[in-house]
């Protein structure tokens, strides 16, 4: 336990905040190339085949990122843009792929929340 004089002299050092998306290096998005596109199963109690891709970023990091929405056109060597944002039931998946940008197609039939899925406004 420090004395008052020790606290006056040195003070308390605030705990460093842990970065949840280190691969982005402070950027809002990063570009990368898919090295593997596959499905994986979520943690209990959920059950599904979640679509994910291993992406090598321009800064050399290799991360696993989630492919949101129904259906996708991604394969190996597709160029994608990733953003931060984890998937709660997939351990180790801390990034999302942006739809409708670079090689990733948007979702054609999407009516609501279109901006998240790169969908054009329906006529």
Swiss-Prot record:
One term of GO molecular function: structural constituent of ribosome
InterPro entries documented for this protein: NA-bd_OB-fold, Ribosomal_uS12, Ribosomal_uS12_bac
UniProt keyword terms in alphabetical order: Methylation, Ribonucleoprotein, Ribosomal protein, RNA-binding, rRNA-binding, tRNA-binding
GO cellular component: small ribosomal subunit
Tagged with keyword Repeat: no
Record flagged with keyword tRNA-binding: yes
Subunit structure: Part of the 30S ribosomal subunit. Contacts proteins S8 and S17. May interact with IF1 in the 30S initiation complex.
NCBIfam families cross-referenced by the UniProt entry: rpsL_bact (TIGR00981)
Name of the molecule in the record: Small ribosomal subunit protein uS12
Organism: Gluconacetobacter diazotrophicus (strain ATCC 49037 / DSM 5601 / CCUG 37298 / CIP 103539 / LMG 7603 / PAl5)
């Amino acid at each position: 336990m420090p004395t008052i004089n020790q606290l006056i002299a040195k003070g308390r050092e605030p705990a460093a905040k842990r970065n949840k998306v280190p691969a982005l290096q402070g950027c809002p998005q990063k570009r990368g190339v898919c090295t593997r596109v596959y499905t994986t199963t979520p943690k209990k109690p959920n059950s599904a085949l979640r679509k994910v891709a291993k992406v090598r970023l321009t800064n050399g990091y290799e991360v696993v990122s989630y492919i949101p929405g129904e259906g996708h056109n991604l394969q190996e060597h597709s160029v994608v843009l990733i953003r931060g944002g984890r998937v709660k039931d997939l351990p180790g998946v801390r990034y999302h792929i942006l739809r409708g940008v670079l090689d990733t197609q948007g979702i054609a039939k999407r009516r609501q929340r279109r901006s998240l899925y790169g969908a054009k406004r329906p006529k």
